[in-house]
């Protein structure tokens, strides 16, 4: 009983917070109360604030992805990180925490962008930032260089909405913007989604297509894991790359 009470008391409800932090916590919880928002990532909560609802999906595989990045890259050569399609910012926060990086997230959804910034304010975080932006070939060319870029589960959406040529141009430009790259995408073997048929160019072996595509761009494959998603029983290739 004492342990339960201690656990409850250790969570900060925000009642004694400065106004800026209270507003940030209120915003975070207002988003979490919205049933239309799907939590595909955990919420970074290092100070154990009291957050509404805990039914975040795929937490285990999200943390496994983060751990794979940390274990497969040599961070003696990595000081900066860009996460394209950062959602709730979890990869940005965890890599900045683990490796003391200058880390930036790019997110086109204004709600998720604001959510990530609220986490920054609430926890007094430094060396992390977020930008609200939909990536296009033109905007990609204007990006600064980063040591490591994460492009996770965005490629297939660009293919669907803007076409393969646009997605391919973005990928080729990103090659020039980084030294290390981590990639994951929806695959043609995931049937029944609005983007599935747009990926038919992947052919009968989506994992092989992803591998060969990255090699043809000029990357050296360092490591490939296969992780599940909330969408299907199948897995996606999670590929860690370096400039060859």
What are these regions (language model features)?
Residues 177-189:
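Conserved beta-strand signature within the Rossmann-like core of class I S-adenosyl-L-methionine
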Residues 89-93:
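Glycine-rich SAM-binding Motif I of class I
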Residues 58-77:
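Conserved alpha-helix/loop element of class I SAM-dependent methyltransferases that forms part
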Residues 158-173:
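A short, conserved alpha-helix within the catalytic core of class I
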Residues 116-117:
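Conserved SAM-binding loop
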Residues 77-87:
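Conserved class I S-adenosyl-L-methionine
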Residues 150:
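A conserved beta-strand element that flanks and buttresses the S-adenosyl-L-methionine
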Residues 102-107:
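Conserved SAM-binding motif I beta-strand of class I
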